[in-house]
A protein has these predicted regions:
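Extended alpha-helical targeting/anchoring segments
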Residues: 7-190
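Extracellular interaction modules
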Residues: 1-6
Length: 190
């Protein structure tokens, strides 16, 4: 079983040298690093419920996407012989990147604070095979179409040292690719 912890979003600038500087700043940012440690710990705890020999395969690998820079770690383990894929799925969901820690209390706070249900956002899409294989991906940075209206959303990890303006900027950075897709679609229509 494998789980990826992706966090710590910095906006890409489209310039190799500037992106390199932003990557160095991201790797040196104490708040972003503390947040990432929390997410890796959550993934380790989640996998340990149904797996043994849980380990971190790679830690804080820099990954570049069209609009953002992420730190990504992968946690894996060997599924226990008595584990069942559905229970394993339930025990690892929702991902810590969307709940925070401690997970149960964080989910209670999200339910109390957020004004509406998250819908597909933060859920997952995937499959459970007849052979017991399970594969899922978190539905973030995704459009949902209802009644001829497109909906999309993003969030940011709030921790003790969070800065409101930086967290809002992180949300906007995450939405950059979706906004660009809308702009391109509008140009095609017009």
């Amino acid at each position: 079983i494998k789980s990826s912890a992706a966090s710590d979003v910095y906006k890409r600038q489209g310039n190799i040298e500037v992106d390199k500087q932003r990557t160095e700043a991201l790797l040196a940012d104490p708040k972003e690093n503390a947040e990432h440690v929390m997410l890796v710990d959550l993934a380790r705890n989640d996998l340990s419920r149904n797996a043994h020999d849980v380990q971190v395969d790679f830690y804080k690998e820099v990954q570049y996407y069209s609009h953002v820079i992420h730190l990504v770690s992968r946690v894996s383990g060997e599924i226990n012989t008595d584990s069942d894929p559905v229970k394993t799925y339930v025990d690892t969901f929702p991902a810590g990147t969307l709940s925070g820690a401690p997970k149960v209390r964080a989910m209670q706070l999200i339910t109390d604070i957020e004004h509406h249900n998250r819908g597909a956002y933060g859920g997952c899409i995937g499959f459970i095979g007849l052979d017991g294989d399970l594969n899922q991906a978190i539905t973030i940075r995704t459009f949902v179409s209802r009644g001829n209206v497109l909906y999309y959303q993003a969030g940011a990890g709030i921790v003790a040292k969070s800065n409101d303006e930086r967290e809002l900027q992180e949300v906007n950075n995450k939405l950059g690719a979706l906004k660009k897709a809308i702009d391109l679609a509008e140009k095609l229509i017009n």
